[in-house]
Amino acid sequence: MALLREGHRCIVGIDEVGRGAWAGPVVAGAVAVPPEIYANPLVLSDADDSKRVPARRRQALADEILSVTSTAIGWVDAWLMDALGASEATHLAMRTAVTALASTTRDGAIDGPGWHARRASGVARSAEILLIDGYPIGNPPAPQRAIVRGDRECLAIACASLVAKVARDTFMTALAHPFPDYGFDRNVGYGTRDHFGALIAHGLTPLHRRRFQPMRHLDQCSSAHAPALPSPTRTAPTGRGQLGFLDGWDTL
């Protein structure tokens, strides 16, 4: 890899999941892949853009990524997305993930109003350069290079895409229990015909992004809302791999 030949030793890939969803947080993964992994074609050989990896394979791949890399997850809640807008909220999730990756506390935990980040695996790593899928982010915490289709072309970005996808899907699927009418275990917060029907029938939840359509229109037309979101548990569910800790996210 050219960046390794240039002398960079901590190359961090970043990608987001959930920017275009109707409900739930936007989530960013930040992954520092050790140089020796690039030299071994047998390790992480199936890592790819999370949209191209079958759902049944994502959890196993995410667990493999966590076992050999330093990884952090950052997320921004729906209400803060409404306040900041999708682009700035996504950039904030990415920046906090990189900051948590470098934090020397036990789990790299950092939090603010409506945003949170944790290190999910590995030791603290301070990025020398950031590789980002698509477009540059504002106020990056390290020098950055944006790569078009980076989640398909760059191992570190593909890894970030996968862990962010698994983390967010795990979280949204767990919310199908307190909010059974919205099909979060199937749509993970994205827009579908059934999801729209649930919004018409039951109103908006605190997870829904009121600045986004069609929620903005529905919010203006009706004052009916679903009950408040229950306090999240701090117990990781069984059978969800190493990303089960994300069930403890504070979502409001």
Label every model-predicted segment.
Residues M1-L252:
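RNase H-like, Mg2+-dependent phosphodiesterase core
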